Amino acid sequence: TDWYDLLFRTAFTHQHSVSITGGNDRSNYYMSMGYANNNSVTIGEGLERYNVLAKINTRINRNIHLGLKVSGSLSKAEHPHTSIDVYEYAYNTSRAIPLRTASNELYFYANEAGRNGVLSYNIMNELNHTGNKNDNSAIDVAVNLDWKVASWMRFSSILGLSRSNVTQENWGDEQSYYISSMRQSPYGKMLPNPIEDSEFAERYCLLPFGGELMTTNTRNTSYTWRNSLSLMQSFGKHEVSGSIGQEVRSSKYDGLSSTQYGYLPERGKKFVDIDPTVWKRYGALVKSHPDVVTDTKNNVISLYATAAYVYDSRYILNFNIRTDGSNKFGQSK
């Protein structure tokens, strides 16, 4: 069996985009939409992405310019389950092991001696009954202002807002070897009665029914506001310049990671109830994998000032000062 030929393919990527641009002597705009699809060299692995972009720049008068930029993206990625290393499997698995039987059914070979029977493995079955997917969405908005207050003074301001959401799912159903190993029993075989065979329920069987669903959801909301005022003036051989500015940044992360058991994706993504007082090793498993909540916020404020004096384009004197504050710095006593 040529495992490399069965588990890998020629990577194929295609991208498409359309854009519109236009304007007049006071304003201009640009808009685009794009789509990309990447089928990775590994079967069952790929990425699909959509993105949009819009930019508008306008001159309100001869001294004030205003710009707006909005962009968004949506992507979906699929990978093999984290328990599967396709490259290692193709390299280490004997070529004498077939993928299918003579009747074209999947061929399963003994891979582990479970407590309630031999656990058999087939890589295609494993890829079909497990998965790992990532969904990512993001939107960014930026507004910038440029104001020529006077011939020797200029003010600029930039405000940026962004929001993103990442959802990850790593799952395996009860037909997979991954779950069979947790169950310590091959799929389809009746489990021992946990009352009559308490050792099986207390010491061996991690997950008697259903599969496993691990999910992680992370949301990020952030903004940046930057302002600066610059000055420059010349008096004969003297040239004076300087600037002052501030920047405020804030970023908030909210997330939840959870592992749920008894997952039945083929039955409407429902979950089966399992009594942890009867299946005691399962009860210990649930206790050892509590939900994890993420809730962090980072705030930063920066102030700066610069000044420069030049005489006769030969002698230069510079001055710089900056201060930063953050909720991560702690408190001074």
Name each model feature, range by range.
Residues V18-N24, V52-T58, V141-W147, N227-L231, ...:
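Residues on the lipid-exposed face of transmembrane beta-strands in outer-membrane beta-barrel proteins
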Residues T1, S40-E45, N51, K55-A138, ...:
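Surface-exposed loop/interface segments of Gram-negative outer-membrane beta-barrel transport/assembly proteins
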Residues S19, Y30-S32, S156, S241-G245, ...:
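Structured core elements
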Residues T13, N24-D25, N61, K148-A150, ...:
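Outer-membrane beta-barrel channels and translocator barrels
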Residues F12-H16, N298-L303:
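Conserved alpha/beta core surface patches that mediate binding of polyanionic ligands
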Residues V52-A54, S157, I301-A307, Y311, ...:
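Extended, hydrophobic alpha-helical segments in both membrane/secreted and soluble proteins
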Residues M33-N39, L317-F329:
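Transmembrane beta-strand segments that form the barrel wall of outer-membrane beta-barrel proteins
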Residues T1-I43, H81-S83, E126-H129, D146, ...:
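Residues embedded in well-ordered regular secondary structure
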